[in-house]
Amino acid sequence: MKLHELKPAEGSRQVRNRVGRGTSSGNGKTAGRGQKGQKARGKVRLGFEGGQMPLFRRMPKRGFKNINRKEYAIVNLETLNKFEDGAEVTPALLVESGIIKDEKDGIKVLGNGTLNKQLTVKASKFSASAKEAIESKGGKAEVI
């Protein structure tokens, strides 16, 4: 067998069935949609239940989206160990080093893990445990 003699496996390459292209095609006229009726004509919207009150309208409304909500990028203490002892950690430095992807509405430092270095950390918010851990190592937690 040579390269120009290669053929696809039997039945692996089926021709697309084009519906509604004449009666002799086997799928003309009604194009596989049956006889008259709602489903033969147009489309029904997503979640349509045949005129019955749809599920999403039977359920009660709940909650709301607070337009003033602030979403903070989270940084834990254990990730701050990547920086050198005595370094000043800023939001720009965190983005540059790839610890966070986006600054969002600010940065919040949480106290997960242990901090082994003396750092000056500048962020929008600190949890109480994170602030305590940074200051116990001789560092500073500055709110910007």
Swiss-Prot record:
Residues 23-35 have a biased composition (Gly residues). It comes from the Bacteria. Residues 1-10 have a biased composition (Basic and acidic residues). The keyword Manganese does not apply. Keywords: Ribonucleoprotein, Ribosomal protein, RNA-binding, rRNA-binding. Residues 1-52 are annotated as: Disordered. One of its GO terms (molecular function) is rRNA binding. One of its GO terms (biological process) is translation. GO terms for cellular component: cytosolic large ribosomal subunit. The keyword Ribosomal protein applies. Binds to the 23S rRNA. Part of the 50S ribosomal subunit. Belongs to the universal ribosomal protein uL15 family. This is Large ribosomal subunit protein uL15. It comes from Ligilactobacillus salivarius (strain UCC118) (Lactobacillus salivarius). The lineage of its organism: Bacteria, Bacillati, Bacillota, Bacilli, Lactobacillales.
